[in-house]
Amino acid sequence: MKQQIETPERRVLAPIFGVSRLRMATDGDGVTTLVTFVGCPLRCKWCLNNQCHQHIKDIPSAKLYSPRSLYHEVSQDNIYFQMTGGGICFGGGEPLLRYRFIQDFHQLCNGRWKITVETSLNVPGYCLRELLPIVDHWIVDIKDMNPDIYQRYTGNDISPMLKRLDHLAAYREIRKITIRVPHIPDFNTDVDVRASIARLREMGFTDIDEFTYRKPIKP
């Protein structure tokens, strides 16, 4: 029997629980496909994708993809991506934890599609640095810039996020960064949100999306 060679690509597999096609004006420019990874370092109280914390075997829609198998699946919308300037948005979960997968996927795209990443930035620095050269649009959900509010809402320390945010602020292509600042029921106030936005503007961010979280309805 011929031995199967394990290439680097074969070793880069990622659990994905959603591939949502033909999205418009929600995840970046043009028509996009949203790809959502399993796994997240945060435990947000009003998480809208709570399945990202489950094991892949417990998520009916989830399966393991290689960069190439995902590429083949999403290529069916190639004409829409190219006609509208769209592409793929990686979310989750926390997509930066799958930076190697995204790097390999980007090589397969060969620059034809835009790559957008929606992230909390609460990750080690190398996860961000590895993707800075190839991501076309960053969408950052900061939760809140107040450390106490952040800790209560996410269950995590704010420090990693702030360090990564400083790194992004120093990035030469700041226009490619959208910062999402949520009103979080029971956790922050309008005053807190205004304070977060003021601090972000001081850092140099200009594309700021203020919105309101909705509490998930309990069954």
Locate each region found by the language model.
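N-terminal [4Fe-4S]-dependent radical SAM core
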Residues: 1-64, 76-82
